[in-house]
A protein has these predicted regions:
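Hydrophobic alpha-helical membrane-association signature
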Residues: 32-35, 84-87, 117, 190, ...
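Short, charged, surface-exposed hinge/linker loops at domain edges
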Residues: 216-222
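Terminal peptide-recognition signature
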Residues: 17, 21, 36, 54, ...
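Conserved CoA-thioester-binding segment of acyl-CoA-metabolizing enzymes
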Residues: 1-57, 93
């Protein structure tokens, strides 16, 4: 896979994805969208990948959309945006629904679509210096990248409305208090703690994690009865896995369960 917007490696069942256009602020441009979708596909279908760790190089996590590209040609703007979001939105959906849990590490400013993108991750860790800037209303547009879906679920509907309409910038502590991120980690410990979390998840019951991720997504729109039925069907599927059976036997034998992701 040839990449220009990212660095990518797989180590110990963790797919490590790094935003790698530091000289441009890691923008969510067409190259980003296309390659992010390629990476999402790889992480979805590769059985050796059991968790995903996303971080970034440079002064910013991401400045969000590429305003220079957006403001270049008014006649083509709608077509340009539609083409770019097609790949980006497919990627976000794949990361949200894949079996592998996704961990995002934010060391600095995340703006616009980057905030929406990280809101879709399963875990988000941030340095104290990280900031989260809504950005969209500043240029007269609306949230994309799943922001209108994930932000209300992380922050609550009223808080998400305030964040987006008033074009707020949250500190790392404010983001943690709002539910946008999991926790704030000292900068010197951030990379290690994120890797430990991704590694721990990579050693877990991957297929069960995937079922849980999809149940949590469905819970926002399902009735109680339909969600109970979804749970029953998912439980039937996971109890057929080697991981579930072997873990039950290990617990009965007072041994530590070892999960293989199958």
């Amino acid at each position: 896979m040839k990449l220009t917007a990212f660095a990518f490696e797989i180590k110990d069942s963790v797919a490590h994805i790094t935003l790698d256009q530091a000289d441009r602020g890691n923008p969510l441009d067409r190259h980003f969208a296309e390659e992010f979708n390629e990476l999402a596909t790889e992480c979805s279908i590769n059985p050796d990948i059991r968790s995903v760790l996303i971080d970034a190089k440079g002064r910013f996590f991401s400045v969000g959309g590429d305003l220079n590209a957006l403001a270049k040609d008014r006649a083509e703007l709608a077509h340009f945006v539609s083409a770019a979001t097609a790949d980006l939105h497919m990627a976000i959906s794949r990361f949200a629904r894949m079996n592998a849990p996704v961990v995002v590490v934010v060391h600095a400013l995340a703006a616009g679509g980057a905030v929406a993108l990280l809101a879709g991750a399963d875990f988000v860790l941030a340095a104290p210096a990280a900031k989260f800037y809504a950005a969209f209303s500043a240029i007269g547009i609306i949230s994309d990248s799943g922001g209108s879906y994930f932000l209300p679920r992380r922050m609550g509907s009223r808080r998400a409305t305030q964040f987006l309409m008033l074009n707020e910038t949250l500190t790392a502590e404010e983001a943690a208090e709002s539910g946008l991120i999991n926790r704030v980690v000292a900068p010197e410990a951030l990379a290690d703690e994120a890797w430990q979390l991704a590694s721990r998840l990579a050693q877990g019951p991957t297929l069960a994690f995937g079922e849980l991720k999809n149940l949590l997504i469905a819970s926002a729109t399902e009735t109680l009865e339909s969600q109970l039925e979804n749970e029953a069907r998912a439980m039937a599927r996971v109890t057929r896995t080697d991981d579930a059976w072997n873990a039950m036997q290990a617990v009965l034998a007072k041994q530590k369960a070892t999960f293989k992701g199958r």
